[in-house]
């Protein structure tokens, strides 16, 4: 998959974990996983990777929601997710399917959906609600290129892909970058350097986890593996500390 630096698919889910949230039928016109405090004035929007609303990102949202936050995970792909054949296509048909899927995940196609999600959150939680957002892989790209990103007070990016230093010049809030060993370090450094002149740089956080693979906080997280579990939990703890500044 051109948006991912590795060719592995989604990992098996944690069967022993019981989700704490619920599916809502219509947030921004999409089915959405919600977890957390309904009356919270601090809301986070989670933007999935190409594997959709995986159980892993729902479990991560539950971890964040245990701390007085309200978390919304909209299904921006409407149930359509990347298959392993799209990740590593072998045949002409598989390559064509990947090309069509890549067209569907073009960031500008999802900006209007994101705007509708924000509007619904403001309707539910009030105009004075504080909104942050976090995304995985491709989802991080959508967030940092969103034209109305000033509505976000903070943006978290886990194993971000498709990094372009030009994007950094248009981000108007602190960011938290949690990168894996698979992201190109030169691309990460170029993005960070482009952001250094931002007044929000001093409040931002960048860390690369050299033992972790691309996707360790999302659908590629193998939570039966002790080391992946350790860094999965640590990643969400870092996100929580970053977003707690909104309180």
UniProtKB/Swiss-Prot annotation:
This is Uncharacterized AIM2 family protein C977.15. Belongs to the AIM2 family. Pfam families: DLH (PF01738). One of its GO terms (molecular function) is hydrolase activity. PANTHER family: DIENELACTONE HYDROLASE DOMAIN-CONTAINING PROTEIN-RELATED, DIENELACTONE HYDROLASE FAMILY PROTEIN (AFU_ORTHOLOGUE AFUA_6G01940). Coiled coil: none annotated. Keywords: Cytoplasm, Nucleus. It is found in: Cytoplasm; Nucleus. GO terms for cellular component: cytosol; nucleus. The keyword Membrane does not apply. The keyword Isomerase does not apply.
